[in-house]
Amino acid sequence: MDQSTHLTWRFLFTGQSPVNFWRQWQDFDLDNNLAVSLQATTRDLQTASQALAWFFRAVVTAPSTMRKQCINAFGVSPQAGDIWIVHGDTLSTLLGSIWAKRNGGIIAHIEAGLRSKYIFRPFPEEINRRLVSRLASLHFPQDEVARLNLVSQSVKGDVIPTHGNTLYDALEVLRDSNWGEPLPDSPFVVANIHRNENLSSTDRWECILETLCLAAQEQPVYLVMHPPTELKLKMDSAAHQRLAKAGVITLPRVTFRRFIQLINKSRYVISDGGSNQEECAYLGKPCLILREESERVEGLNESCLLSKFIPEKIHQFLASPESYARSKTIFSKTPSSIVVGGLQDAYAKRGTA
């Protein structure tokens, strides 16, 4: 939020993905003095065991230790009644909510209300969502389905629909950015595969490999590597060789700014990520979603095709990806402006705005 909102903010970083976090922070030219890492980590987590060890170290951090770190970084410490903003459904979302409760904070959850039908799928995201909804008292669902999920759960506090994801505002900020090495003029495809349920399933992994190889028959496919995917291909050298032989080019994980440039210039996107689904929906970019189900409604049956790993659907998309192209989304009132308004109202009710 900018200075015109009259809300003072600080960013507490959990340490889950330090490399990627600071890259994104720099993408938006944010002041490093406004962020502090509460867990000393130097690399993005790759394995479930690493994530588990990090989470339990972080969750037992004493409030007094956290307050001391904040005073050293910002000159102030968390106060009872402060609003703590958490976003999404990661372990960091849950961790931030726990920290907020321990410090007497009010939890505002952005991207609230997303639900699957299964508590362990996706794991641990679905569990994180449900727990955070019980802890939060300000809920910002991005669509009507998410809002109704919160209503049916009888969550406490205010439910404030944003009618879209705040990711839209991030895309708008970077819309005209021109940064980095020039991109190819010839057609190419961007792929982004990283979900645990896909990397750990033999059948799904084979379907993903086959899909990427089929796409590469017509144009180069740039597979952007997440830490879990990189580890998977190191362990499965035959798959790595198969992709390389087919014309799939692996790229080191790039910054958010660069990734959006790649999406914008690409012919289409292949992904198993919910955020990528939203990005493509807002940009009007064709996207083949390699998942069984998606909790998000953005772009479905429009620019985004949910494959459910059905070969006929995958072939249908690959045969005519341009038929899924749509116009870019335009909001009259952006999701982030709605969130900021909700925060201002919450502070006003508290008597401190």
Stretches found by the model and what they are:
Residues 226:
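Conserved C-terminal portion of the radical SAM core fold
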